[in-house]
C-alpha cells in the first residue's frame, strides 16, 4: 500500500524553505517560542500543519486529497533580535483553505487549535497579508472615510467625540441631557460606553429615544450634523439587529458595536445592514487586551484591525499614542495606516511585516480615546491628522463648569490647532503656546487648561 502509518516529523512535509509565495496565498508572521529542545524548523512546520491540513499522525484519508494543493507551508524562519528563544515563522496558506467573506473562518483556521499546541511555549500572530483575491470577497466598512465626511458635511479636521460618563447608572432622560449638552457645545459625536447595552436602570429603547431627541435639538440649534453612537450590541444577533433597525427608524446617523465580545459573525451581519440602510458603524474593541497585550502570545492588534476592516466598521478605537514610548508611536501609526490607506508598504520599523493592498476597500477612521484632554490636542492633531476621531470623555464631562463648556473648550482647542497647522506652524514644538493663545479668547478653554495643567505631556 502507498500509506505508511505512524508519526513523522512535521518538518518533512510542512517546512519548505524553497517555496515561492503566490499572490493568492494568505501569509502569516508568527512569533514562536518553542519548548526547550524543539528545533525552530520543527516548531514552525508544526504551526503550519496544525493551522491547515495536518494532524498528529499520518492518516489513511490523506491519500484522498492533494496535500500539495492544500497544506500550509512554513517558508521562512528568522531569529528575533535580543530574544534567544524566539523566532518569527512565516507561513503561507493556500486561498482554498478559507471560506469567502468570513473573518470567522479565517481566524478559526489560522489562530484556532494551534495556539494550545504542546510543542510551543507561546505563539503570537504578528501580522497577516490578505491577498487581493480574498479581500475582494469582503464588503468591508459600510461607508468609509470619504462617504462619512460627505454625510456629515465636515472636512479638513479631525472629528470630536465624547463618551457619556458615568458609564453606568444614569436614567435615559439624564443620559439624553448629557448628550444634548455635549453636542450643543460643539462636539460632532457622543458615544454610548461599550458596557451600555440594555440594563435595568436604562433600557435600550428609552435611551435611543432620548438620545435621538438630543441629537435633533442640538442639530437645530447649531446648524451642524450631529451623531450619537447608539450601542446595538446585545446578547443575541436578533436583538442586535432589532436595535439597529430602531436606530434607523429614528433617522440617526450612526450605531455602534463591540466587535470582539459580539463576535465577527454578528459584526459582519451588522455591517451589511448598516451599508444597506445608510447607517455609519462605530466599533469598540473591548476585550482586545485579552488577546493582544502579551508580547509573546496571542495576536497583535494590527491583525484585529485588519480583520475589522474586512468584517466592516467605519470607526475603530486604536489607542492614543500620546505620553507613550516613541516606539509605541511608530507601531500605532503603522496599524492606523493599515486602517485608513489603500496600500501600505512593508515596514518592519512600524511593525508591518507584509505589503498590504486593500484594492479600494473603504477605510476606517481610527478613534483616539482614553485619558486625553485639551493639552494633548496639538499632539493628537499632528499624529493622527485629519482622518481621525478624537474622543474626550472625562476631558469633556470633567470640565469645572459642566458638559457644554467642556465641549466648547475641546472644539476651540481643535480649531486652533488645525488653523495653526494650516498656517505652517509646528504643532510638536509650539503646541502648548497655541493652546495658551487660544484660551485668551475662550474662557471655557482657559478653565479647562487650568484644571488639567499639572498633567504634563512629554512629546
UniProtKB/Swiss-Prot annotation:
The modification N6-carboxylysine is found at residue 191. CDD domains: RuBisCO_large_I. The active site is at 165 (proton acceptor), 284 (proton acceptor). The modification N6,N6,N6-trimethyllysine is found at residue 4. It is an enzyme of class 4 (lyase). The record marks 324 as: Transition state stabilizer. GO terms for molecular function: magnesium ion binding; monooxygenase activity; ribulose-bisphosphate carboxylase activity. Heterohexadecamer of 8 large chains and 8 small chains; disulfide-linked. The disulfide link is formed within the large subunit homodimers. This is Ribulose bisphosphate carboxylase large chain.
Amino acid at each position: 500500500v502507498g500509506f505508511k502509518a505512524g508519526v513523522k516529523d512535521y518538518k518533512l512535509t510542512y517546512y519548505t524553505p524553497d517555496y515561492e509565495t503566490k499572490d493568492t496565498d494568505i501569509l502569516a508572521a508568527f512569533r514562536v517560542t518553542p519548548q526547550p529542545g524543539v528545533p525552530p524548523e520543527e516548531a514552525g512546520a508544526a504551526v503550519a500543519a496544525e493551522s491547515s491540513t495536518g494532524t498528529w499522525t499520518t492518516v489513511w484519508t490523506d491519500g484522498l486529497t492533494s496535500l500539495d494543493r492544500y497544506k500550509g507551508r512554513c517558508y521562512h524562519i528568522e531569529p528575533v533580535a535580543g530574544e534567544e528563544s524566539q523566532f518569527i515563522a512565516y507561513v503561507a496558506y493556500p486561498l482554498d483553505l478559507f471560506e469567502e467573506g468570513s473573518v470567522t473562518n479565517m481566524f478559526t483556521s489560522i489562530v484556532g487549535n494551534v495556539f494550545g499546541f504542546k510543542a510551543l511555549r507561546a505563539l503570537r500572530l504578528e501580522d497577516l497579508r490578505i491577498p487581493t483575491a480574498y479581500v475582494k470577497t469582503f464588503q468591508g466598512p459600510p461607508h468609509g472615510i470619504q462617504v462619512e465626511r460627505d454625510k456629515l458635511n465636515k472636512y479638513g479636521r479631525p472629528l470630536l467625540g465624547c463618551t457619556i460618563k458615568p458609564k453606568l447608572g444614569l436614567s435615559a432622560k439624564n443620559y439624553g441631557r448629557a448628550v444634548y449638552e455635549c453636542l450643543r457645545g460643539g462636539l460632532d459625536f457622543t458615544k454610548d460606553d461599550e458596557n451600555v447595552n440594555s440594563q435595568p436602570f436604562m433600557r435600550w429603547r428609552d435611551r435611543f429615544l432620548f438620545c435621538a431627541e438630543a441629537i435633533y435639538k442640538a442639530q437645530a440649534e447649531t446648524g451642524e450634523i450631529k451623531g450619537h453612537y447608539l450601542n446595538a450590541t446585545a446578547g443575541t444577533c436578533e436583538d442586535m439587529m432589532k436595535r439597529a433597525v430602531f436606530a434607523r427608524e429614528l433617522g440617526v446617523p450612526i450605531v455602534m458595536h463591540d466587535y470582539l465580545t459580539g463576535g465577527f459573525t454578528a459584526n459582519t451581519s451588522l455591517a451589511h445592514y448598516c451599508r444597506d440602510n445608510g447607517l455609519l458603524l462605530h466599533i469598540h474593541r473591548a476585550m482586545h487586551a485579552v488577546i493582544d497585550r502579551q508580547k509573546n502570545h496571542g495576536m497583535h492588534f494590527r491583525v484585529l484591525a485588519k480583520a475589522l476592516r474586512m468584517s466592516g466598521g467605519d470607526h475603530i478605537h486604536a489607542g492614543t499614542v500620546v505620553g507613550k514610548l516613541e516606539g509605541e508611536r511608530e507601531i500605532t501609526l503603522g496599524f492606523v495606516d493599515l486602517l485608513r490607506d489603500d496600500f501600505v508598504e512593508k515596514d518592519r520599523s512600524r511593525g508591518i511585516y507584509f505589503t498590504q493592498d486593500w484594492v479600494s476597500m473603504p477605510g476606517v477612521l481610527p478613534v483616539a480615546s482614553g485619558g486625553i484632554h485639551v493639552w494633548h490636542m496639538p499632539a493628537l492633531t499632528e499624529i493622527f491628522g485629519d482622518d481621525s476621531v478624537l474622543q474626550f470623555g472625562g476631558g469633556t464631562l470633567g470640565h469645572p463648569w459642566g458638559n457644554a463648556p467642556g465641549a466648547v473648550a475641546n472644539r476651540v482647542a481643535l480649531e486652533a490647532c488645525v488653523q495653526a497647522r494650516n498656517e505652517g506652524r509646528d504643532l510638536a514644538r509650539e503646541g502648548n503656546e497655541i493652546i495658551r493663545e487660544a484660551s485668551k479668547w475662550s474662557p471655557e478653554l482657559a478653565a479647562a487648561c487650568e484644571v488639567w495643567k499639572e498633567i504634563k505631556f512629554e512629546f
